[in-house]
């Protein structure tokens, strides 16, 4: 039993773990996927000389240098650097800006003088200059981006890896059902190359999915061996290769690559051939097989040659006789030429018929080189050659050109250039390092991964492997294997996007170089960075993979950053994705979670990374394994991708082992090549590092996951992400040990950056004096706590300190809790007392019955913060104004507004209340004489403006928690804006003064330490030279003068000088930071065009749990609150404690999520143990007795290891704090697949002193009678989900109407009405309610004039009105008119 954590918070509440398997490998940081990828892209903290050729550096290197068309100028990329971002993260969120740093690129423009006679070039000038290339968004510490003030996440994309893939159509294409094999070469960017067999067994090629060509046309177009040999020779001789005429592959070369030549020899009137075991294996002989040398019969006619017989024959026989039938139908391997006359007897690939063979025999030919076409080598390439109309390179190139660019007249040069650009030009074709590595592995070739274009060998080898597949040798590829799918993380996605922007820019630069005087311009004159900046902006703003962060709670943030999507640009589409690509694959083990995936339409397309998974430099997902040698587990672990794992035999983490790590079972359950087997221990080559490496973070938070049905586990994992942060959070009593890791890595808590001592603390900040091991001050860290801030989902972000002044913290310790965290652990819900029983039908169909205590004590109360904003614009009629002076509004409505017309912080507001008063100038309307008179008398009147104030929308009631006022630069700030600015400057001043105070204290302490014991030097008034410096001497002088004291020791003087320099520099940095922040505050804000002032108001709404709210446990056990029952009516225990929640027991058996029952029992045991510890603590604090009893109780529940290491050594004060934290229940961890067993739960129930069955006798609160039988009662961790009835409930009397149909809009967001549809009309017809129906279809919907008449009638208190023609009828008539049918209502003849 091991404790999960021993951090600062871990010591305050120790979680007992039931895990038996030791955790060998540490879990990687949960959001490293994002951070590592973007850091590798920017290489921001790497010096320009040391940067790797990757990411941004690689993009610039690939696009530059840019040459002009005349060859006189060249623009080279030297390096890039980032300046400091203009605003920090918090300022960007407040002001609605993008958190980004300006990117400066140093470019060199070289110009040449060209000699017109000789054409030689000499350098004329070189100019280097940094050029601004737009702003590059930066990632926050939490792996997110701030774009226009909102936090966004770039989701990683899964796509098919570049490389070569072999597949077949599964027999679906052709009616005969035969497999048509295909191969596809996928580059990272560039043209796709597809090879395929057709129904006639000919091989075709497609380039970019265009019309197909015989594959031999492509082979003709490739450079021939003869040409390549000539080229090599020319280069070796130092000659020029430009003039060489390129010759392609010919028939001989093509055939000789794909087929061996078998020499058939004529011996004494009979033909003979070498005996090849492969060619004869499996054949049924039509005639006896005769040894050509001895004449001996080695196999009888009608015999079927088995592998054994063939081996036996091959031992003795070299050449065998063949009949004429064996030769007929075979093909010549190469041209048969009479060497004397040059006459061609037969061409390569020609088929031997009876006549042709007879003619050759007559000519006296005794040796025929024939292609090795037989049962194991098909004539596919030869047949394709015969069907191909082209016969040379030029014809082939023109054929390819016509298909790629139809309608353009081909020439030899253009066809040559186009073909070269398709696959052999680095600028247009890039396999990427991954593609090359994958291709090398699949084709069994060895090319360096820097070679990113195709080679002739790659194409030939691909075709050869496809032919082998057709011949029945080899395996096709599984495209759903994670060895063939890779992850594109944020850095790579950004790299591709930036490349697009730079390529757009490149064209503009080239044209500009041609249109200006190249000798006089500087690099920045040629650059317009807008295309690059626009590409970045477009990616972050509107890409499918750039998503508004799910910020409901810390878990949803972490999960969103670890998400893998198969959708998005260059990925799959929902409609096209089949079952296979969505399914769980054996290679997902430890890499992608088999449980957590998105809901219905996206199931299997949006996945989550497993807990231990990492993404390697090639983009493949890796998972760690412990290596095993000769049945012994080795120390350490190794991260392996799916390809590397293929060869391994992997045992599970729970395989039994002795103390030396030797596997002890006779047979071990393992995974090998995607199958489950049992093997002896000596065959095992690896072992899992942890049982939870299989699942994702959310699934690893579900205790007893192994006892839940997979569908319910999926719901449980997904619903935890929807849990709303509660006002009072509880960490789960029954956890899994993952809670602390999620809280730490999510960024919701505040984590100490370095070791230190808490110096000051209040509700909004923590000041830490950073120290080294010896206690010397290293600096000051000020941590600002986020107070009542709004998240993306309108939940409340609020942080609370966990430390007190004087506490020592270490780097990585959690010093403040955030939303949904408690004592440094994730706390999504509350532990509540639950009974499984029916109660008057109120828990029918998963309804949940709750006690009034839950609503009264704010057990499930959450705070939601709504943001409202209003802008004062400069309109054509004049400026809008934010003011308290609003026409026709009484003083009562203005009671919450200050003199500037903005609501006070702390005001309680209700629907319809004015938050910000605003007036807009009205258009000039013609005045009546009376108005003119009034205007002449009273001057300007308020009637010139109309009220456009920001009012609180219906359905919201709350408290104002924050107001922010933004004013345009140059516009005078109002009193409220000045007050906010003053408060902010005061806060910054306090930070500066505190930081300076700590630095000063530290400086003078260190100065004092160095001076005491030294001898004073000359030059300081008050201390005579040669006097020993003591504490008394120093105390006589003000400490500000100590820095001027000199000493006789040169060494100490140098140290003092260094100390002074460090102090001066630290103070300068603090002041510079303060000045910069104040300057930003006073500068005024960047607002959208035409906006003079903007006000944001934040309203906090407190939501109690009420009927209609959705709740859930962690096991997919969800339901809606049906009724709140008075505490006195709820069933209660024999000790008088009423249960909090009543759940329906029928929700368990059919759902098969038994985990909730086990959690209930274990929670019951934990709570009772906690209660007994609480009693002992109370007694001890009251009387000082029972301390030993308390220690014994802790020893009993925690076991020897934890007690001796962590509890027994605690000082008294910390022991009491620990015991008090256990009062609500002993927290335990039951890790997934390695948790508490049934005997463990029974043992815990026994220790708690309750019934081992986990059931208790309940008494009916209404009658006071005991229930007939005992009931399962215990503590379950319940969550309140983000589906709140207050957000869904909606009512409308009058609201907006659709412009065309004039019918009310639909939906809460549009403040719409209820649709009275076709079926509802039938219902009213059935009742014969004619008048009601008429109202529904006319005046209550789209009869415009009727609506007005009804209103007027009601105002006049009359009850008669007439319905007119619904507007939808007029729309129908207009529709008919558009078809040329004139429909008119003729009333004259009536």
Curated annotation (Swiss-Prot):
GO biological process, one term: DNA-templated transcription
Catalytic activity: RNA(n) + a ribonucleoside 5'-triphosphate = RNA(n+1) + diphosphate
GO MF: DNA binding; DNA-directed RNA polymerase activity; ribonucleoside binding
SUPFAM superfamilies (alphabetical): beta and beta-prime subunits of DNA dependent RNA-polymerase
Pfam families: RNA_pol_Rpb2_1, RNA_pol_Rpb2_2, RNA_pol_Rpb2_3, RNA_pol_Rpb2_45, RNA_pol_Rpb2_6, RNA_pol_Rpb2_7
The protein's Enzyme Commission number: 2.7.7.6
Keyword entries, A-Z: DNA-directed RNA polymerase, Nucleotidyltransferase, Transcription, Transferase
Disulphide-bonded residues: none
Gene3D superfamilies, alphabetized: 2.40.50.100, 2.40.50.150, 3.90.1100.10, DNA-directed RNA polymerase, beta subunit, external 1 domain (2.30.150.10), DNA-directed RNA polymerase, subunit 2, domain 6 (2.40.270.10), RNA polymerase alpha subunit dimerisation domain (3.90.1800.10), RNA polymerase Rpb2, domain 2 (3.90.1110.10)
One Gene Ontology term, aspect cellular component: DNA-directed RNA polymerase complex
Assembly: The RNAP catalytic core consists of 2 alpha, 1 beta, 1 beta' and 1 omega subunit. When a sigma factor is associated with the core the holoenzyme is formed, which can initiate transcription.
Role, per record: DNA-dependent RNA polymerase catalyzes the transcription of DNA into RNA using the four ribonucleoside triphosphates as substrates.
Family statement drawn from the similarity comment of this UniProt entry: Belongs to the RNA polymerase beta chain family.
Protein name (record): DNA-directed RNA polymerase subunit beta
Protein's organism: Gluconobacter oxydans (strain 621H) (Gluconobacter suboxydans)
Name of the encoding gene: rpoB
């Amino acid at each position: 039993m091991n404790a999960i954590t021993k951090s600062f918070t871990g010591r305050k509440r120790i979680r007992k773990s039931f895990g038996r398997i030791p955790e060998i490998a540490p879990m990687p940081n949960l959001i490293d996927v994002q951070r590592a990828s973007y850091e590798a892209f920017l290489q921001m903290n790497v010096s320009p000389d040391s940067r790797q050729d990757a990411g941004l550096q690689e993009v610039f290197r690939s696009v530059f240098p840019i040459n002009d068309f005349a060859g006189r100028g060249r623009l080279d990329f030297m390096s890039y650097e980032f300046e400091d971002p203009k605003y920090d993260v918090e300022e960007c969120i407040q002001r609605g800006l993008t958190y980004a740093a300006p990117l400066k690129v140093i470019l060199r423009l070289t110009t040449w003088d060209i000699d017109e006679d000789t054409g030689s070039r000499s350098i004329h000038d070189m100019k280097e200059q940094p050029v601004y290339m737009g702003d590059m968004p930066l990632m926050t510490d939490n792996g997110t981006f701030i774009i226009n003030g909102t936090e966004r996440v770039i989701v990683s994309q899964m796509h098919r890896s570049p490389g070569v893939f072999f597949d077949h159509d599964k027999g679906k294409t052709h009616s005969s059902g035969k497999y048509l094999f295909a191969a596809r070469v996928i580059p990272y960017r560039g043209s796709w190359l597809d090879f395929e067999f057709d129904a006639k067994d000919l091989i075709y090629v497609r380039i970019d999915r265009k019309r197909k060509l015989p594959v031999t046309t492509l082979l003709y177009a490739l450079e021939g061996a003869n040409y390549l040999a000539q080229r090599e020779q020319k280069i070796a001789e130092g000659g020029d290769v430009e003039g060489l005429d390129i010759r392609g592959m010919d028939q001989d070369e093509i055939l000789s690559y794909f087929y061996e030549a078998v020499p058939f020899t004529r011996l004494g009137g009979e033909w003979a051939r070498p005996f090849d075991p492969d060619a004869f294996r499996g054949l049924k002989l039509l005639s006896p097989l005769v040894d050509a040398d001895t004449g001996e019969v080695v196999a009888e006619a009608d015999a079927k040659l088995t592998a054994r017989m063939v081996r036996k024959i091959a031992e003795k026989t070299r050449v065998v006789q063949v009949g004429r039938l064996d030769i007929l139908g075979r093909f010549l391997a190469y041209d048969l030429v009479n060497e004397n006359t040059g006459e061609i007897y037969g061409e390569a690939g020609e088929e031997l018929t009876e006549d042709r063979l007879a003619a050759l025999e007559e000519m006296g030919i005794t040796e025929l080189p024939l292609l090795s076409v037989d049962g194991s080598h098909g004539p596919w390439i030869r047949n394709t050659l015969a069907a191909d109309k082209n016969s040379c390179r030029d014809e082939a190139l023109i054929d390819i050109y016509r298909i790629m660019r139809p309608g353009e007249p081909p020439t030899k040069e253009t066809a040559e250039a186009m073909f070269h650009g398709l696959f052999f030009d680095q600028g247009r074709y890039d396999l990427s390092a991954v593609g090359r590595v994958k291709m090398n592995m699949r084709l069994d070739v060895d090319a360096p991964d820097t070679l990113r274009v195709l080679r002739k060998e790659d194409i030939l080898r691909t075709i050869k492997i496809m032919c082998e597949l057709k011949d029945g040798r080899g395996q096709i590829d599984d495209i759903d294997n994670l060895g063939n799918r890779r992850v594109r993380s944020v850095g790579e996605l950004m790299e591709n996007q930036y490349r697009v922007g730079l390529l757009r820019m490149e064209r503009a630069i080239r044209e500009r170089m041609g249109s200006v005087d190249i000798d006089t311009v500087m690099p920045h004159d040629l650059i317009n960075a807008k295309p690059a900046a626009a590409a970045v902006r477009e990616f972050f703003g509107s890409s499918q993979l750039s998503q508004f962060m799910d910020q409901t709670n810390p878990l949803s943030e972490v999960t969103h950053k670890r998400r893998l999507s198969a959708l998005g640009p260059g990925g799959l589409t929902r409609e096209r994705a089949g079952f296979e690509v969505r399914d769980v694959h054996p290679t997902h083990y430890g890499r992608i979670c088999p449980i957590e995936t998105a809901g219905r339409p996206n199931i299997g397309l949006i996945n989550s990374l497993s807990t231990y998974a990492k993404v390697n430099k090639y983009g493949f997902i890796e998972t760690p394994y412990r290596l095993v040698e000769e049945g012994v587990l080795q120390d350490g672990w190794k991260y392996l991708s799916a390809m590397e794992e293929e060869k391994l035999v992997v045992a599970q983490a729970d395989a039994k082992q002795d103390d030396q790590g030797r596997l002890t079972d006779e047979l071990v359950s393992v995974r090998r090549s995607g199958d489950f087997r049992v093997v002896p221990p000596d065959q095992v080559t690896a072992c899992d590092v942890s049982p939870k490496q299989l699942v994702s973070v959310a699934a690893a938070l579900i205790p007893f996951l192994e006892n839940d049905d997979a569908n319910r586990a999926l719901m449980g994992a997904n619903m935890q992400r929807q849990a709303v942060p509660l006002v009072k959070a509880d960490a789960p009593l029954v956890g899994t040990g993952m809670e602390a890791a999620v809280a730490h890595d999510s960024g919701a808590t505040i984590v100490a950056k370095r070791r230190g001592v808490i110096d000051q603390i209040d509700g909004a900040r923590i000041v830490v004096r950073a120290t080294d091991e010896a206690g010397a001050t290293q600096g000051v860290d000020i941590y600002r706590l986020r107070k009542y801030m709004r998240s993306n989902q309108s939940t409340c972000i609020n942080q609370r300190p966990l430390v007190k002044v004087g506490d020592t913290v270490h780097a990585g310790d959690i010093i403040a809790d955030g939303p949904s965290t408690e004592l440094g652990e994730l706390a999504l819900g509350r532990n509540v007392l639950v009974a499984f029983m029916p109660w008057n039908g109120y828990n029918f169909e998963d309804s949940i019955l709750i006690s009034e205590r839950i609503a009264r004590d704010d057990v499930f109360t959450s705070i939601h913060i709504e943001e409202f904003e209003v802008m004062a614009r400069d309109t054509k009629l004049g400026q809008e104004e934010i003011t308290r002076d609003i026409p026709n509004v009484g003083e009562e409505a203005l009671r919450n507004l200050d003199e500037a017309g903005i609501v006070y912080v702390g005001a309680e507001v209700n629907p319809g209340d004015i938050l910000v008063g605003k007036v807009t100038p009205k258009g000039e309307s013609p005045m009546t004489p009376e108005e003119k008179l009034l205007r002449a008398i009273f001057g300007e009147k308020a009637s010139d403006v109309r009220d456009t104030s920001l009012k609180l929308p219906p359905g919201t009631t709350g408290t104002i928690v924050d107001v922010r006022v933004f004013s345009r630069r140059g516009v005078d700030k109002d009193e409220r804006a000045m007050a906010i600015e003053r408060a902010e400057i005061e806060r910054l001043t306090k930070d500066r003064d505190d930081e300076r105070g700590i630095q000063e204290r530290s400086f003078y302490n260190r100065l004092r330490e160095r001076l005491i014991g030294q001898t004073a030097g000359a030059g300081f008034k008050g201390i005579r030279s040669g006097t020993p410096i003591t504490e008394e001497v120093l105390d006589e002088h003000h400490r500000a003068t100590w820095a001027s004291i000199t000493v006789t020791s040169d060494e100490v003087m140098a140290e003092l000088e260094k100390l002074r320099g460090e102090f001066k520099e630290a103070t300068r940095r603090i002041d510079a930071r303060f000045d910069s922040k104040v300057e930003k505050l006073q500068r005024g804000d960047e607002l959208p065009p035409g906006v003079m002032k903007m006000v944001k108001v934040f309203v906090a709404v407190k939501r109690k749990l009420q009927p209609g709210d959705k709740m859930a446990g962690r096991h997919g056990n969800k339901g809606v609150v049906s009724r709140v029952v008075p505490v006195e009516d709820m069933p209660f225990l024999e000790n008088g404690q009423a249960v909090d929640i009543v759940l329906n027991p029928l929700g368990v058996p059919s759902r098969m999520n038994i985990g909730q029952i086990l959690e209930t029992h274990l929670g019951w045991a934990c709570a009772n143990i906690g209660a007994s510890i609480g009693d002992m603590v109370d007694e001890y604090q009251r009387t000082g007795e029972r301390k030993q009893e308390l220690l014994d109780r802790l020893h009993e529940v925690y076991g020897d290891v934890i007690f001796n290491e962590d509890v027994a050594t605690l000082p008294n004060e910390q022991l009491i704090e620990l015991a008090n934290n256990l009062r609500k229940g002993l927290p335990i961890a039951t890790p997934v697949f390695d948790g508490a067993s049934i005997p463990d739960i029974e043992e815990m129930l026994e220790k708690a002193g309750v019934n081992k069955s986990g059931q208790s006798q309940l008494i009916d609160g209404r009658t006071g009678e005991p229930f007939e039988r005992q009931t399962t009662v215990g503590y379950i961790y319940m969550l309140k989900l983000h589906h709140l009835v207050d957000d869904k409930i909606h009512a409308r009397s009058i609201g907006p109407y659709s412009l065309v149909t004039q019918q009310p809009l639909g939906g809460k967001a549009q403040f719409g009405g209820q649709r009275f549809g076709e079926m509802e009309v039938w219902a009213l017809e059935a009742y014969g309610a004619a008048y009601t129906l008429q109202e529904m279809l006319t005046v209550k919907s789209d009869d415009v004039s009727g609506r007005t008449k009804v209103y007027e009638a009601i105002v006049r208190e009359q009850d008669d009105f007439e319905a007119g023609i619904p507007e939808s009828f007029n729309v129908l008539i207009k529709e008919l008119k558009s078809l040329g049918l004139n429909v008119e209502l003729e009333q004259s003849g009536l």
